Design a protein with these regions (language model features):
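Flexible, small-/acidic-enriched active-site or ligand-binding loops
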Residues: 162, 220-249
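A short, Trp-centered hydrophobic/proline-enriched beta-strand micro-motif
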Residues: 142-151
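N-terminal glycine-rich flavin-associated loop
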Residues: 110-130, 159
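Long, acidic (Asp/Glu-rich), low-complexity accessory segments flanking structured domains
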Residues: 247-264
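Alpha-helical interface subdomain recognition
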Residues: 1-104, 113, 126-131, 138-143, ...
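Short Ser/Thr-interspersed hydrophobic loop/turn segments at strand-loop and sheet-helix junctions
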Residues: 73, 96-102, 197-199, 214-222, ...
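A short core secondary-structure module
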Residues: 172-173, 177-225
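Short glycine/proline-enriched turns and hinge-like loops at secondary-structure junctions
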Residues: 88-90, 158-161, 186-191, 205-209, ...
Length: 441
């Protein structure tokens, strides 16, 4: 892999004309249907008797939004296969996902929530007809939720070769033992199935030791030890759960794609998933700057609007510039996936995953600052938005892994193209270099 590979076609970042009506319809649906009911959805969940359940009326409200979305054809459009979705290109979906990121329940309302989107794409691409009928169909219908179990408590899971949760074939069943934690969505009572990354061949080549297996949540061998907190919150009823597999038996046919092909599936799932996260993050940044500007223009201190005090106007300007630079990077990464394929575009995917969450964190932090104490209170969504983005710097690979992928690719590009041997003296101490350096001082 040599650097951030480009083609002339990748610089055309326009949305497809045939997708424009869908984009406009999604934007209108979120504004007219989802936004007016968002506060009510969360209000209904306050003071509920069952913490790992939903308040009276919550799911009914969400189901009504889903029904309206289905009626308008705004359903499963994230899938690249036109038989089950709209057949959108990654670039086209990037524009839509940005709108989804502006509202915390928009993705659920249109059946485009993580981790379901990644799991549905895996099942759609590599699932058997039986697996699709049993699990993909209810997911596509929005009838159930799902989880993806990869991270483990006792190993650095950023290197997936370390996966130690074992699955041993016993006759016609896989027997799974081990632990997983921070399994997002596993606390939701609607979560019925998870895709579990396990070690099936410990003596095989490093990238052929793992497999991915479908495990029903109600399997008696699955024990939920409790929620893993994120910034002091358990994120109920969604949750990020700590799971233990105790002689968990599942049918042999529950394996996806075949034994030892877990890494292949991860590339199918995690590449698009990382892009989707970054797309939604741009939407969160847009919401943060909107709140920042409105607060700055409507609040006064020392006889002036807050926006004009100190460096606040510079803060707003930098936020807008950063959003537009991130947007272009994410759109280019999406176009790279369309033009080059997921594997060839993985350096682009790592580039945006390393860049976007940390910059969006910074923008939300500035919005919090302009709001004062209200910025960290229950009266604005900014605190939750910040913790979500800060967590994203760890989810689907920490920043450092993605910086490494990009840096390594850049080094390889120079090695492959020029066989360069770097001599700093040749760069900085030649007569020409001295002239340039002096001119720059």
């Amino acid at each position: 892999m040599a650097g951030l590979e480009t083609t002339p076609e990748m610089f055309d970042l326009r949305m497809s004309e045939e997708v424009r009506p869908l984009f406009d319809a999604v934007k209108k649906f979120i504004t007219e249907e989802v936004d007016p009911h968002t506060n009510e959805f969360f209000r209904l969940g306050e003071g509920r008797e069952e913490r790992w359940g939903y308040g009276e009326g919550q799911l009914e409200l969400l189901d009504s939004l889903k029904a309206k979305a289905k009626e308008q054809g705004l359903w499963n459009f994230f899938l690249p296969d036109a038989e089950t979705g709209e057949g959108l290109k990654n670039l086209d979906y990037a524009y839509i996902a940005t709108e989804l990121g502006k509202n915390p329940i928009a993705s659920q309302s249109l059946n485009c929530s993580a981790p379901d989107t990644g799991n549905m794409e895996v099942l759609e691409r590599v699932g058997t007809p039986e697996q699709k009928e049993k699990w993909l169909t209810p997911l596509l219908n929005g009838e159930i939720r799902s989880a993806y179990a990869m991270t483990e408590p006792d190993i650095p899971s950023s290197d997936a070769k370390n996966i130690s949760c074992r699955a041993i074939l016993d006759g016609d069943e896989w027997v799974i033992n081990g632990e997983k934690f921070y399994i997002s969505g596993a606390g939701d009572p609607r979560c019925k199935i998870m895709i579990c990354m396990v070690q099936t061949n410990p003596d095989g080549p490093p990238h052929k030791r793992q497999s991915q297996i479908l495990v029903p949540m109600d399997n008696p061998g699955v024990e939920i030890l409790g929620p893993c907190h994120v910034f002091g919150k358990d994120d109920a009823p969604h949750g990020h759960m700590h799971l233990r597999f105790n002689d968990c038996r599942v049918p042999k046919d529950n394996i996806l794609l075949g034994e030892g092909r877990g890494f292949e599936i991860s590339q199918v799932r995690l590449g698009p998933g990382r892009i989707h996260h970054c797309m939604r993050s741009i939407g969160a940044a847009e919401r943060a700057i909107e709140m920042m500007v409105k607060r700055g223009l409507t609040r006064e201190a020392f006889g002036k609007p807050i926006a004009s005090l100190g460096k606040n106007i510079e803060v707003i300007a930098k936020a807008r510039i950063e959003i537009e630079s991130m947007r272009r990077m994410v759109l280019t990464a999406a176009k790279a996936m369309d033009e080059l394929g997921n594997e060839a575009a993985r350096v682009w995917v790592s580039a945006v995953k390393a860049m976007v969450p940390i910059r969006v964190c910074h923008i939300i932090d500035e919005a919090i600052q302009i709001h004062g104490a209200a910025g960290v209170s229950q009266w604005t969504p900014l605190a939750d938005m910040y913790t979500s983005q800060r967590t994203l710097r760890l989810a689907d690979g920490p920043d450092e892994v993605h910086w490494f992928v990009v840096g390594r690719a850049e080094l390889r590009r120079w090695e492959e193209e020029g066989g360069i041997k770097y001599d700093p003296k040749a760069d900085y101490y030649s007569e020409d270099s001295k002239t340039v350096l002096t001119a720059g001082i």
